[in-house]
Amino acid sequence: MYTRNVQKKTINFDSFAVKAKRDNTKYLDDSPASQIVKELEPTERDLVVDKSYASAFFGTPLISYLIKLGVDTLIVVGGSSSGCVRATAVDAVTRNFNVAVVEDCTYDRIELSHKAALLDLWMKYCDVVKSDEVSEYFASLKQSSH
């Protein structure tokens, strides 16, 4: 499942852009900045959730999709660690999901913000793991399903 930041032409939901008096049209639906990079491009079977706020849960149908699919655990990656990743992880925990944030698959504009966000998430909300731990987890799921 993927999320992407998409803004509407008529409304600027990004309060930071408003505060900084920035034009936020780079995140319109058809702009390159709102697209998922080719190397990680979703397949036809993948769900893509468009969001306008930091949390992937706020104002989106994400919770409905997860419940319908019987999901109990979320593995969160992406950016920014102190913004979208943190907001999504915290919201997922408040909805009773098990959550892991993948340390080496998340990023932030400033390394200090990245480290502080991961520390805060680990101390209060969820597991912070490395990508090799996630690979081992998926391998164990495959083995147990055979």
Residue ranges and their predicted role:
Residues 1-10:
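Von Willebrand factor
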Residues 7-8, 17-146:
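Active-site-adjacent betaalpha module
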